[in-house]
Amino acid sequence: MSKILDGKVVAAAVKSKVADEVKKLGREGISVGLAVILVGDNPASQIYVKNKKKTCEELGIKSYEYLLDGNVSEQELISLIDTLNNEPSINGILCQLPLPGHINEQAVISAISPNKDVDAFHTQNVGKIMIGNFDFLPCTPAGIMEILDYYGIEIEGKNCVVIGRSNIVGKPMSMLLLHRNATVTICHSKTRNLKDVTSNADILVAAVGKAGFVTADMVKDGAAVIDVGINRDNGKLLGDVSFDEVSQKAAYITPVPGGVGPMTIAMLMKNTLTAAKQQNGR
């Protein structure tokens, strides 16, 4: 039976450190502020925004919410971002994705000042991750690295397989593992003989978006399996990994919920703190 990698425990440790540093900055007269923009009324996005606000309050970070109508124009949205870029009390800006179809997401991401881009989606920050000289890391991959380190799972020299090549998880995840001297393979929908590749992984990261996609026969004995998937089925949250069978074979596994999910918001808070420190010369 696998050891459960508890993201709630790791997230609590990260948030505790952030809260301490926010207090320390407060004693120096520096506040930390995060602006969250939500366009439209996507229910899942509303839940994420609510959770971010709650976590900000817990850690002493000021939360600024901008709730815009789903019909807002791209130019109006970019104009708001421009205002926030120039507002000293706001250290981080996050525009909740997905955006309505009439708005170009990349144009909006590019409008956010790179030093306030706490999601690390701006092309400048993506480029910095590529060369290993980064200020911010995308929250989910950074959270996964935090989990691996917290539980002492060795990365250097290991075979790591990432299933999924999204800009939000798959690609940056592979770069972070590479920077830690792992041998990394990225798999996707066109990968041939997927099972042959994944069953060689010491660390397997599943970011596919299909419930129960990874089965026991795809996993190496003693592997660490990281499940990024959040799939809803009849009100139940399911990961990309078939937990019951894979947990009998892997040495380590993250559950869904309670694995990677809690880390994403914790790392967002850490990025916001980093932004505040940089903007105030700390």
Kindly give the residue locations of the regions a language model identified:
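Positively charged, low-complexity intrinsically disordered leader regions
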Residues: M1-I30
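Short beta-strand segments enriched in small/hydrophobic residues
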Residues: S31-G40
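Short, well-structured alpha-helical segments in soluble
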Residues: E76-P88
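Short glycine-/small-residue-rich Rossmann-like dinucleotide-binding loops
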Residues: P98, A207-K210, G229-I230
